[in-house]
Every structure is written in structure tokens, then in C-alpha cells.
């Protein structure tokens, strides 16, 4: 067992190494070159298009004529695919963010198919992990096996590769540029394997039938939500459609700082630029059509049903927080995201009331208390998938309101007004006279 004096050389060695590291950091700082990035200016923001694919994206915070037109066209396409008629009920599905908790939504969808009551959705939207499952939810029960595979067989190594601690340290002190703690090449490869030419062709086919698939990303420079018309991209025939389709899915699921952003080649005016896009959950944890489509008037007087799957627990969960920077920061961010997600559920409820949609909400139940041991814990995801599956195949009791919402008088419809009395030709009130047709 070495005595105390013998430990001192090790301490001196550590100090020497730290001194060398500091000198190296200063040396590197003088010669590092940032990766070229040429974003459009704010003045050009509303002119930005994907080269060769105009009208396939829109800002989520303002009306979009291209998405509005796509909605109108969807009615004619639906009629053409349905012998000139519109379905009496139209269904929408909104899939939220939640990382590995997306296993819950995958389980709900697969169990719903097993129950035999899962409808065909005219509109499917996805944010973050919801964006990864949205194309397969859109294509229906035939792709349940893909959903199950994606959320029950993967682990951390299938999604990301962490950078070395030294690289992260150099990035933190702004010496060596690094866009994130990890590289997401594994996730890109997973998406490329799951979304092939066949999937793209089937999304295009359903788009031509009047159905719509939308995914949201965050344009990081603009601090705005971008809504992508995925069916229009799939149906475009553009040789780069598949590459773009996959990139959008990855971008929507790229949590800033943990995953690197995705860069999109765009054009505006006479110039070519790059846009930086990250997780759609930065702007909203779940979306419908936001403000890109005016208050819903498309489709006549048919019944509309909106189903929302929130891949997260919505009620507070007690956890003893260690008085350390990492634990306090992690708990604060988790609480912020949970609060934002609840606010988004209320926002969609407001849209539902405005646009006459019946609101149905599913979320991870309180009694699911298993803790994950990593960012993508296979055992945890399998357990959560099974929870969602069992709930749905037994007839899931969808919640009609956002969490803790007390409808009170807000939901109480006034009694119908009595019919005004009929008056005779002499102006006196008399019984209603019914005339038989001739």
C-alpha cells in the first residue's frame, strides 16, 4: 500500500496534464474554423422554398395558402376515391413528442388495431418521436409490426453515439465547435432502413386519396414551427423526395444540444441558403394544423373526431432531487417540458372547440412507475409498449378534456329555445297548421 508522500507525484502529474490541456485549448482556439453556415436573412424568411418542391412547407404561426389549398384538394380527392362521396365522419390523429416514451403511443396504435376499432385517419400529425411513428400510423395496421420493432427492439446504440468527454469539454469552453453531445448517424440509418421507396410510394398513394400527413420541425434561426406536407413531398416525383422525407423525420426528433440539427438546402429570391432545423418539440409538444389553416371550414357539416396521444405522463411525479447542478437542471427541464406539453393539450382543446372537433386524449397512466436506465432503455420501452397495447385492445377510455380541466358551465349547452308561436292571418296566436303535400 503506497504511503501518502508517494501519492504526490500523481497529483503533480495531474496538474501538469491540466496545464498542458489548458495550453492545448488556447492553441486550438486560435486555429479552429467553424463549419460554413449560410442561413437566409429574416427579410427572406417568407420566400424560402425547397428547390424543386414549392409549397410543401409552411410556417405554423400564420395562414398558409399552400396548406389551405391542399385541404381543399383533399376533399375532391376523397370524393374521387369514394365514389363521389365524403365519409360521414372524419378522423384526425396527433402524435406528441416524448423520446423513448413514444413506445406508449406505438402500443396504443397496435392495441387499437387488435381491438378492431381503429379508424382510418384523414389527418395524421407528428412532433419529435411522434414524427418518427407518424408515417406508419398514417399507413395503418399493415405497419404495426414496424412500429413495434422501432419501439421495442432498439437501444441507445441504435439512436446515437456519444462524443468523447474531451471533445465535449472543448465544446463547452467554446474551443472546438461541436453542435451536440452526440452524433445521430445511427438514428439516420434507422430511419433510412424503416422508410424506403415502398413506404414513400404508399404515403403518396394515400395522399392522392385525400389523406394528409404533416410533421413539424423548429427553424432554429427564426424560432418558428415549420409544418411539412409529407404526402405532397412523397407524391412529388422529385428524385430527392425520399432523402428530404427522411431528413424531416430526423430533424423533428433531434433534441437540440443532445442531437445535432439537420440542415436543409433552400432557395429564396435568387440565392441558395441553408436552414438549421431541430426538434419540433421546441415549439410545441403536439400539433394539429396550427394557424397554417384558417378555422376549419373545409369538409361541410360532417362529424369530426380528434385523437391525441401524449407520449408522456401529464400529472406531477414526486422525485427526490439531489442538490447537484446536473440533477437540478435535469429536473427543471423535465418540469418545463411537462408544463409546456399540458399547455399544448389545452391549446388543441381550444382548436377543437373552435372547429367543432370531438376531443379524445390518451396519456401514460399514473400507475406506470418503472424508471428507465438510459435514454433508450429496451426493457423500459417494452414495458411501456405493453401498457399502451393492453389499454387500447381492451377499449381505451379516451379522456374528453385536457388534464385537470373542469368543464363547469363551459361545457353545459343551453336548452334549445322554444319554437316561436305561429300566428293566424288575423294576427292571433293559434295552433300550428300542417299542410299535406299535393
Regions found by a protein language model. Name each.
Residues 12-23:
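Sec-dependent N-terminal signal peptides
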Residues 27-30:
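C-terminal motif of bacterial Sec signal peptides marking the signal peptidase cleavage site
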Residues 32-123, 138-438:
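Patatin-like phospholipase
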Residues 125-130:
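Gly/Ala-rich beta-loop-alpha elbow adjacent to hydrolase catalytic centers
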Residues 133-136:
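Hydrolases whose catalytic domains are alpha/beta-hydrolase-1, hotdog thioesterase
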Amino acid at each position: 500500500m503506497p504511503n501518502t508522500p508517494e501519492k504526490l507525484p500523481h497529483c503533480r502529474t495531474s496538474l501538469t496534464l491540466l496545464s498542458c490541456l489548458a495550453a492545448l485549448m488556447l492553441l486550438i482556439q486560435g486555429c479552429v474554423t467553424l463549419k460554413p453556415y449560410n442561413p437566409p436573412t429574416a427579410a427572406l424568411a417568407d420566400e424560402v422554398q425547397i428547390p424543386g418542391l414549392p409549397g410543401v412547407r409552411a410556417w405554423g404561426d400564420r395562414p398558409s395558402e399552400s396548406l389551405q389549398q391542399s385541404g381543399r384538394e383533399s376533399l375532391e380527392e376523397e370524393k374521387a376515391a369514394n365514389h363521389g362521396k365524403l365519409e360521414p365522419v372524419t378522423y384526425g390523429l396527433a402524435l406528441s413528442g416524448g423520446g423513448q416514451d413514444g413506445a406508449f403511443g406505438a402500443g396504443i396504435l397496435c392495441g387499437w388495431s387488435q381491438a378492431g376499432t381503429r379508424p382510418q385517419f384523414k389527418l395524421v400529425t407528428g412532433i419529435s418521436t411522434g414524427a418518427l411513428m407518424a408515417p406508419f400510423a398514417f399507413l395503418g395496421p399493415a405497419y404495426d409490426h414496424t412500429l413495434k420493432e422501432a419501439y421495442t427492439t432498439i437501444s441507445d446504440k441504435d439512436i446515437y453515439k456519444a462524443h468523447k468527454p474531451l471533445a465535449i469539454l472543448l465544446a463547452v469552453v467554446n474551443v472546438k465547435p461541436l453542435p451536440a453531445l452526440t452524433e445521430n448517424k445511427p438514428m439516420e440509418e434507422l430511419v433510412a432502413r424503416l422508410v424506403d421507396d415502398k413506404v414513400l410510394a404508399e404515403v403518396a398513394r394515400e395522399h392522392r386519396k385525400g389523406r394528409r400527413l404533416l410533421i413539424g420541425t423548429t427553424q432554429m434561426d427564426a424560432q418558428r414551427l415549420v409544418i411539412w406536407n409529407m404526402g405532397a413531398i412523397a407524391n412529388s416525383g422529385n428524385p430527392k423526395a425520399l432523402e428530404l422525407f427522411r431528413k424531416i423525420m430526423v430533424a423533428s426528433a433531434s433534441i437540440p444540444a443532445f442531437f445535432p440539427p439537420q440542415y436543409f438546402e433552400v432557395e429564396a429570391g435568387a440565392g441558395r441558403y441553408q436552414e438549421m432545423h431541430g426538434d419540433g418539440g421546441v415549439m410545441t409538444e403536439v400539433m394539429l394544423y396550427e394557424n397554417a389553416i384558417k378555422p376549419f371550414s373545409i369538409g361541410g357539416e360532417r362529424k369530426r373526431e380528434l385523437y391525441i396521444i401524449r407520449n408522456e405522463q401529464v400529472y406531477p411525479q414526486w422525485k427526490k432531487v439531489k442538490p447537484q447542478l446536473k440533477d437540478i437542471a435535469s429536473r427543471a427541464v423535465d418540469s418545463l417540458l411537462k408544463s409546456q406539453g399540458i399547455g399544448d393539450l389545452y391549446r388543441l382543446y381550444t382548436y377543437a372547440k373552435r372547429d367543432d372537433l370531438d376531443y379524445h386524449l390518451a396519456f401514460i397512466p399514473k400507475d406506470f412507475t418503472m424508471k428507465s436506465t438510459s435514454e433508450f432503455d429496451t426493457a423500459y420501452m417494452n414495458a411501456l409498449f405493453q401498457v399502451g397495447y393492453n389499454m387500447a385492445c381492451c377499449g381505451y377510455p379516451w379522456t374528453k378534456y385536457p388534464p385537470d380541466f373542469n368543464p363547469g358551465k363551459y361545457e353545459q349547452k343551453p336548452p334549445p329555445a322554444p319554437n316561436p308561436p305561429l300566428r293566424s292571418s288575423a294576427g292571433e296566436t293559434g295552433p300550428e297548421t300542417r299542410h299535406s303535400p299535393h
